[in-house]
């Protein structure tokens, strides 16, 4: 019975540590997405000069393999009288965070 308060305190400390670790990871992920988003946005603007853009969205992250992770972004492009969606895929190394490539293509 004397060990019950000790056990509760230990569980509480464990929960605090786990929640701190989870928060730190999500912040790193958010910063990583922002980095790749800026690069994708620049590449899309270069590909479609003079166009207007709307509905820009982050579609998600996929682990391609141990050496590559992919972030995908989508935007609606209006160029002259044509409106269409464009997808940008940013490939990067998940450990070093070095960019491997950016692919932009019309959907």
Curated annotation (Swiss-Prot):
Signal peptide: 1-21
Keyword set includes Signal: yes
UniProt KW keywords: Signal
Domain of life: Bacteria
Gene3D superfamilies: Protein of unknown function DUF3889
InterPro entries xrefs: DUF3889
Descriptive protein name: Uncharacterized protein YhdC
Species assigned in the record: Bacillus subtilis (strain 168)
